[in-house]
């Protein structure tokens, strides 16, 4: 909790993104969106391990620079944590760093467990956001809070960059 307190006092070192320093409470925390992953997708052992870890944190708030359950997560911190605790060893990557680890995959070839990448979600060069593709145009990502979301929404379509497959 002390690390979270520091993030709140410093606004995650991004006051342009976090204009207030208040702890969330039940009345201000957004509720996550849930999704039932098709059972056939979970027959893939790597994807099942990824989802076993990833779903533990649904509802956690977005924290700029966060990379563990004790600090909560930002998008790349969340994906890095999930991968490092489900069979990969990628260290702490940025969204661009995660993209660089992947082989690009076409929309026709994307499958559950691939990563999905976006540009222009905030002012930074290169890939700026990432999530885990879970099938049926749905991703699990660290929005605010960690939640499932539909990739067919206008926002995600406007910022979509690529799907990527981990080695």
Label the predicted regions:
Residues 1-61, 158-167:
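Intrinsically disordered, low-complexity
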Residues 60-112:
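Catalytic cysteine-centered active-site loop
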Residues 88, 95, 102-107, 122, ...:
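Aromatic- and glycine-rich peptidoglycan recognition patches
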